[in-house]
Amino acid sequence: MILQGKKVIAIGDRDGIPGPAIEECVKSAGAEIAFSSTECFVUTAAGAMDLEIQQKVKDAAESIGADNLVVVLGGAEAESSGLSAETVTTGDPTYAGPLAGVELGLKVYHVVEDELKAEFDEAIYEDQCGMMEMVLDVDGIKEEMNRVRG
């Protein structure tokens, strides 16, 4: 179980899966929301994670602890999702924000990944994410997330 009993940082995407949709899914899997946000990844520099969100992630990791925290992304594109995943694991690859050079090593998944979907209430996932899943490059996102996680 990835989510059961964990605190989740939900980072949604205006053009992908928004934060509130991720929240509903992860709550159905027995997780608690540490914080949630909906970003516009194409609005930020080169798809990098917003600097304010980086600080919130850093603060949450310090107060909750990396072992009790899971980041769930909702990015519309594989590349921006990968950048966000890298940011919360090995540090900000753009060296622009509070996580530049900071290896938090957080567990990170995209909401469309099978490992997470298996834990969600199926009806809630379908209601919250089903339509967007049809237009996202799910295979590309899964490949990128697996690449980042190694």
Curated annotation (Swiss-Prot):
GO terms for molecular function: betaine reductase activity; glycine reductase activity; sarcosine reductase activity. It comes from the Bacteria. It catalyses: acetyl phosphate + [thioredoxin]-disulfide + NH4(+) + H2O = [thioredoxin]-dithiol + glycine + phosphate + H(+); acetyl phosphate + methylamine + [thioredoxin]-disulfide + H2O = sarcosine + [thioredoxin]-dithiol + phosphate + H(+); acetyl phosphate + trimethylamine + [thioredoxin]-disulfide + H2O = glycine betaine + [thioredoxin]-dithiol + phosphate + H(+). Keywords: Oxidoreductase, Selenocysteine. GO terms for cellular component: glycine reductase complex. The active site is at U43. Pfam families: GRDA (PF04723). InterPro entries: GRDA. Its EC number is 1.21.4.2, 1.21.4.3, 1.21.4.4. The keyword Oxidoreductase applies. Monomer. Component of the glycine, sarcosine and betaine reductase complexes, together with components B and C. In the first step of glycine, betaine and sarcosine reductases, the substrate is bound to component PB via a Schiff base intermediate. Then the PB-activated substrate is nucleophilically attacked by the selenol anion of component PA to transform it to a carboxymethylated selenoether and the respective amine. By action of component PC, acetyl phosphate is formed, leaving component PA in its oxidized state. Finally component PA becomes reduced by the thioredoxin system to start a new catalytic cycle of reductive deamination. Belongs to the GrdA family. This is Glycine/sarcosine/betaine reductase complex component A. It comes from Gottschalkia purinilytica. The gene is grdA.
